[in-house]
């Protein structure tokens, strides 16, 4: 009986491997991926060119098979209606309120990462299969890169924490803008706060120093302040509705991503084991969603979760912020006070926490012309077959969702749709 044989490096093999890669990336076991809504079932999507995940999650995924590298994808917001109703027998004809829309867009581009799998003699000297190791390492790197790009866009800053685990370079790097594809935008004025140690207040500066002290930490009082601000502001980020969460309507949630140091500061201010138990109980009504498990806790309707890397600013580092509700113009010269250093050493820093509601971030996926999906593998033999290079790639783009929203008598304000940033002081671990 004839057997099907798919040759090494053939187009069919690449398509099969790339489809497997796409599935693996979509199911990667990371915090940020769990904040992405599930894609529609194939039966619902097979006839659609543009497929979008649930907008009830913080990260909205759009798979647009009509797009190619460098193209733009647009998305719209229907502005809320205001004004008074018409009562009794008063004339209503011809007085209908006009719908108005705000629009945002993002670009997609090709990202590639090659890994050398060595040559024939390198393979001879080791018992490890270098080709398999190269593929695994490349996939891990691309997963890390995708999560960090999402984190930086949500935070509106890269920060200055840096070690080998960062795949996204510092903003001063010449390739930073091209790697991020879309501009990294500081939080809008109505979405940027700082801790006072007992509450939050809009970010401000004095004498080129951000108005924050080393005692302005994140604690339970500050999280209560966040909830109070959410309840009192016009058009706050909408609650997150996780798939299968039976309590979503009765007990709405937002998600607060915090650094490890901010997490420790919060834990020390309250009985966190009770909060963990509440999160575990909530997971039972949300289909066992792993986001609620482990270190997560629920406080005052806010699910507190550790972020994968800190967005951190040290003494003397600038924190960009918007001084007007009506423009995206950023103040770029105000810095963390020198008092965050002690005897010339970095002892304290400012870490950014990220509060997420629905539709905070958009990730668009394009189509590779060889594989038919956004992710692809390539393997190439060099030097007459002596050496092997493995390449992983993706066709995508990520951007924070931002609209010029109509606030009625307050006019149209530039607004980050589903994310609020809170800056607070931390003591650097290990110092």
Task: Give the predicted meaning of each segment.
Residues 87-89, 161, 165, 402:
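Outer-membrane beta-barrel and related beta-rich outer-membrane complex signature
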Residues 96-126, 352-372:
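Short acidic, glycine/tyrosine-flanked loop/strand segments centered on an H-E-D-like triad
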Residues 1-106, 406-431:
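N-terminal "assembly arms/tails" that initiate or stabilize quaternary assembly
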Residues 96, 136, 152-155, 159-166, ...:
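Short, surface-exposed, charged/polar-biased interaction segments
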Residues 75, 102-201, 247-262, 384-394:
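Long, contiguous amphipathic alpha-helices that act as assembly "spine/axial" helices in icosahedral shell
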Residues 50-51, 126-138, 166, 306-326:
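A broadly tuned preference for mixed-charge, low-complexity surface segments
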Residues 27, 31-32, 36, 40-49, ...:
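Intrinsically disordered or highly flexible coil/loop and linker segments, enriched in small
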Residues 2-29, 33, 175-431:
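Sequence/fold signature of self-assembling virion shell proteins
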């Amino acid at each position: 009986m004839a057997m099907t044989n798919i040759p090494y490096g053939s187009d069919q093999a690449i398509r099969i491997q790339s489809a497997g890669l796409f599935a693996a990336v979509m199911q990667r076991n990371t915090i940020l991926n769990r904040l992405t809504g599930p894609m529609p079932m194939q039966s619902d999507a097979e006839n659609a060119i543009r497929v979008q995940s649930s907008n009830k999650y913080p990260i909205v995924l759009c798979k647009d098979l009509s797009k190619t590298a460098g193209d733009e994808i647009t998305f719209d917001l229907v502005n809320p209606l205001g004004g008074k109703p018409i009562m009794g027998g008063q004339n209503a004809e011809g007085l209908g309120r006009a719908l108005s829309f705000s629009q945002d867009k993002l670009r997609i581009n090709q990202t590639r990462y090659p890994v050398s799998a060595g040559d024939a003699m390198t393979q001879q000297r080791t018992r490890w299969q270098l080709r398999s190791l190269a593929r695994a390492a490349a996939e891990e790197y691309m997963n890390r890169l995708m999560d960090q790009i999402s984190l930086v866009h949500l935070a509106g800053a890269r920060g200055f924490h840096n070690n080998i685990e960062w795949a996204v370079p510092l903003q001063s790097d010449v390739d930073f803008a091209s790697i991020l594809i879309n501009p990294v935008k500081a939080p809008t004025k109505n979405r940027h706060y700082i801790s006072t140690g007992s509450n939050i207040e809009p970010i401000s500066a004095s004498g080129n120093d951000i108005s924050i002290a080393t005692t302005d930490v994140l604690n339970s009082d500050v999280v209560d302040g966040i909830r109070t601000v959410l309840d009192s502001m016009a058009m706050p980020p909408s609650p997150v509705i996780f798939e299968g969460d039976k309590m979503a309507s009765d007990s709405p949630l937002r998600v607060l991503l915090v650094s490890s140091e901010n997490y420790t500061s919060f834990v020390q201010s309250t009985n966190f084991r009770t909060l963990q138990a509440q999160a575990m109980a909530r997971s039972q009504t949300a289909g066992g969603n792993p986001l609620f498990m482990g270190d997560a806790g629920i406080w005052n309707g806010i699910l507190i979760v550790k972020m994968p890397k800190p967005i951190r600013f040290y003494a003397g580092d600038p924190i960009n912020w918007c001084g007007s509700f009506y423009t995206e113009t950023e103040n770029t010269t105000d810095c963390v006070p020198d008092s965050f250093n002690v005897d010339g050493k970095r002892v304290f820093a400012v870490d950014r926490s990220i509060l997420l509601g629905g539709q905070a971030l958009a990730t668009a996926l394009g189509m590779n012309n060889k594989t038919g999906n956004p992710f692809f593998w390539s393997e190439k033999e060099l030097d007459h077959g002596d050496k092997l290079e493995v390449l992983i790639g993706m066709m995508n783009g990520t951007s924070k969702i931002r609209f010029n929203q109509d606030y009625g008598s307050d006019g149209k304000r530039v607004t980050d749709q589903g994310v609020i940033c809170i800056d607070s002081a931390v003591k650097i671990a290990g110092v």
